[in-house]
């Protein structure tokens, strides 16, 4: 059994970590451990004004966040020369270097969502910020900076992300929704055949377009009409507690899963499912 468990590492530092420390840790991983290294970057690199304006335009104006983390986190003018040096070092040692976009984006707890002062934005609201940072850094480095991605990736955008030359892609929020891990099947089908065998560079123009489109994309903007609460009041046991929320949420409690599967195979019998 090989003692080499893996040949790569992604460095995630706490908010406010000085750039000198980030660079020293990354240099150690590259130089001393010989690891292909990625550094997680925060949406705060975009600047407070851009983040606030984007959230307001997309209907997320109720999200409260100040400029503290934008001032305290790694600054863009420090990040670019640091990434340039680490890219050069990795290249000299025959290793890969890149960034992971993005780490968390703190917002204030204002409606007792969690028993804390801050919580972290995720999902479709985070995507426009994360993909905008990806576009900004890609333009800065002419597509030569490798990017791995997390930050609102799901079925609706995974093919576009990978198509720009960004992978691997990590997702979590979408798995908390109906379907859970089975959503990976849809995702896999959508990206099949898109990802080349070898990474060359990022398509900067395609990525810029994706970032611009995300701000007005209906899947990512806040719905004007509030989404109804889909949480069930039904008591379920600790184990074997899965049931279809579509049946519970249906006003007349149709056995929806009973005909969804036959519909996919065109074996639908209309007399038993008149409302399809």
Mark where each language-model region is.
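Catalytic cores of alpha/beta
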Residues: 153-166
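Extended, intrinsically disordered, low-complexity segments
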Residues: 182-237
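Glycine-rich phosphate-binding active-site loops on the catalytic face of alpha/beta enzymes
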Residues: 164-186
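Hydrophobic faces of well-ordered beta-strands that scaffold small-molecule active sites
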Residues: 37-39, 97-101, 147-149, 169-171
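Iron-sulfur cluster-binding cysteine motifs and their immediate structural context
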Residues: 240, 244-264
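Conserved small/polar residues in nucleotide/adenosyl-binding loops
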Residues: 266-272
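Glycine/Thr-rich beta-alpha phosphate-binding loop at enzyme active sites
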Residues: 43, 47-143, 178-193
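Long, low-complexity, polar/charged, intrinsically disordered or flexibly structured peripheral segments
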Residues: 1-11
């Amino acid at each position: 059994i090989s003692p080499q468990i893996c040949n790569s590492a992604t460095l995630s530092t706490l908010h406010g970590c000085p750039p000198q420390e980030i660079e020293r840790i990354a240099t150690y991983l590259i130089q001393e451990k010989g690891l292909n290294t990625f550094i997680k970057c925060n949406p705060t690199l975009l600047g407070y004004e851009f983040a606030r304006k984007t959230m307001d335009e997309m209907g997320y104006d109720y999200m409260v966040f100040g400029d503290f983390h934008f001032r305290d986190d790694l600054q863009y003018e420090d990040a670019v020369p640091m990434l340039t040096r680490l890219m050069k070092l990795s290249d000299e040692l025959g290793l890969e270097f890149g960034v992971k976009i993005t780490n968390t984006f703190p917002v204030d707890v204002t409606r007792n969502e969690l028993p804390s002062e801050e919580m972290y934005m995720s999902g479709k609201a985070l995507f426009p910020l994360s993909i905008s940072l990806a576009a900004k850094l890609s333009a800065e480095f002419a597509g030569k900076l490798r990017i791995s991605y997390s930050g609102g990736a799901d079925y609706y955008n995974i093919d576009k992300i990978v198509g720009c030359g960004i992978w691997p892609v990590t997702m979590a929020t979408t798995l908390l929704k109906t379907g859970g891990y089975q959503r990976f099947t849809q995702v896999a089908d959508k990206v099949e055949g898109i990802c080349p065998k070898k990474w060359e560079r990022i398509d900067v123009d395609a990525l810029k377009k994706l970032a611009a489109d995300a701000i007005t994309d209906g899947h990512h903007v806040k719905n004007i009409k509030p989404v109804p609460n889909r949480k069930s009041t039904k008591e379920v046991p600790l184990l074997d507690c899965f049931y279809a929320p579509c049946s519970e949420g249906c006003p007349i409690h149709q056995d929806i899963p009973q005909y969804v599967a036959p519909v996919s195979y065109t074996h639908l019998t209309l007399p038993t499912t008149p409302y399809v």
